[in-house]
Amino acid sequence: MPARPKRRIRLDNDERRAQLLQLARTAFSDRSYDEVSIDDLAREAKISKGLLYHYFPTKRDLYVAGLREIADELVLKLTSVPTDLAPADRVRHSLDAYLDFVTDHSRAYVSLLRGGIGSDPEVNAVVTGVRKRLAESFVVGTPLEPMLAGKPAFETAVRGWLGFVEHASIDWLENQRMPRAQLRDLLSEVLLAIMRVVAPQLLS
């Protein structure tokens, strides 16, 4: 007696969208944007291309949605850090949370920061937005928080430091030049040095 064909599992809209985003995130992390095929994604999801396009009208829409999800997860990781810590302790705990994400989702992290479809306004907006939210997350709950919006020099310095964090984290992922704890301490000391210059009275 021939085996019965396996029935496809019907997912509700939210489950299907989540499935497609996860497949896309993996694909775009492993391959370049141009190498990712909608046909392959639909085949892997066991749905038609038409149904995939119902959720995401273009490959670019799917790519951008995946980036937004990665950005939200990264910011959420930092918001889990207690806010009732001394500034130096909060910086170190926040960096630990950040590096946890970098370690656990290395491909997604690199994909978020390096992009893959050239200069795209929507992708640039996602990256700019997550950088702003991360800068705020690193100082939220500390006496330095109001200064991020109220003191332009501090805002510029923190965002410049965040760029250093991004490049140092990717270099660490790719080359492992130092232990993770040493990287955390290096990044922490650089930010604390910035704070001492901009607002020494708040760290005394």
Residue spans for each PLM region:
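N-terminal intrinsically disordered/low-complexity leader segments
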Residues: M1-E15, Q201-S204
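Hydrophobic/aromatic residues within well-ordered alpha-helical segments
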Residues: R16, K59, G66, I70, ...
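Amphipathic alpha-helical linker/stalk segments
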Residues: G66-H93, F138-T142
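Amphipathic alpha-helical packing segments from all-alpha helical-bundle domains
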Residues: V75, P121-P146, E155-G163, H167, ...
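Short, hydrophobic secondary-structure boundary micro-motifs
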Residues: V110-L113, A181, L203-S204
